[in-house]
Amino acid sequence: LRDSLITRARNKLVAEFLKQKEYTHLFFIDADIVFEPQQFIRVLLYEQPLTCASYPIKHESPIEKGDASFGWCMNFPLGKYDLADNDKGFKTVNYAGTGFMCIERKVFEQILKKYPTIKYKTDVRANIDNEREAVAVLGNEEYAFFDCGIQGQGVLEDKENTQRYLSEDYFFCALWKQCDGEIWCDLTSTLKHIGIKEYT
């Protein structure tokens, strides 16, 4: 899939996924994530609707230069960042990056049921080379599961009045949490994130 906007690309993939009624899980794996097969299996088979694994932010520690990252693409509940919630090594987190995330069909269905206004129609050719195919996709229905937004505006709630700006992956996590969902992160599968170097 070629698209200049990551938000639109993710939404397009979800729309195609939802058209295939026999599909049960959508697993996002970004091209810059390095993982082992067993890490994929752990996240896929964990019995929760939304699961993921942690990977480092592409940012060096200002104290120790090297391959070690300064942070992780996830956000823990305040004061609960040290231990997994169970002996399988998974923990609930506030938000997580979508670069290595497994999502059951019912997650999208529940969000769409609560927020039907996120539906929109495509207005781009989606980089399709064939003119006839390009015209055919114009006006297709897609859904803004992945968008950027400010908490307290649009469909985003803001109970703590933070007015925080959310990236597209945190936006999606916020929608799912507003449906009483949880984000379960595998803390034992430490992935690598490729940038100007391989961050660990």
Where are these regions (language model features)?
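Short, Asp-centered acidic motifs that coordinate Mg2+ and/or phosphate
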Residues: 25, 49-50, 183
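Short beta-strand-to-loop acidic/aromatic patch adjacent to the donor-nucleotide binding site
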Residues: 22-34
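A generic structural signal for residues located within well-ordered alpha-helices
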Residues: 9, 98, 167-168
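C-terminal catalytic/acceptor-binding lobe
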Residues: 115-200
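Conserved catalytic core of nucleotide-sugar-dependent glycosyltransferases
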Residues: 14, 36-154
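Active-site-proximal specificity loops/subdomain of glycosyltransferases
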Residues: 1-24
